[in-house]
Amino acid sequence: MSKLSKQPPKIIVTKMGFDGHDRGSRVVAAYLRDAGMEVVYTPPWQDIHGVVKLATEEDADVIGISSLATDHLLVPKLMQALREAGMGDMQVIVGGIVPPKDEKLLLDAGVAQVFHPGAALEGIAVAVRELAAKARSLRRDKILTK
């Protein structure tokens, strides 16, 4: 077993754009931390390039975006910026108020999963663990094929 696979999943929990309502993201971040994950929690109002930079610096497995208003519409641009930075294997989840038409847009852009209000915290934790394992596997494969 590699050293990387023994480390707990690492997730960045953030809010992009002008949405400052952070109660939900704080609850999720605390639950994930209590579940043994390494959580990097940012203040609200992050921009796309700041999130990409932080994901690179932190060597995160998953990025969790919280959205109460329409700031989830920035996520397709985040996905593009991640691909341009060579981080196309980054697993991204979105949680919050996301209308069905926007959910399709996010999934089509490469978001791994969308969680709606009332989603079970345990289910979010399971998804983050699975997505972290997937991200690590994709990174290993990328290294081995170079």
What are these language model-derived features?
Residues 1-42, 53, 130-138, 146:
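ATP-dependent carboxylate/acyl-activation modules
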Residues 25-131:
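Cofactor-cradling patches in redox/metallo enzymes
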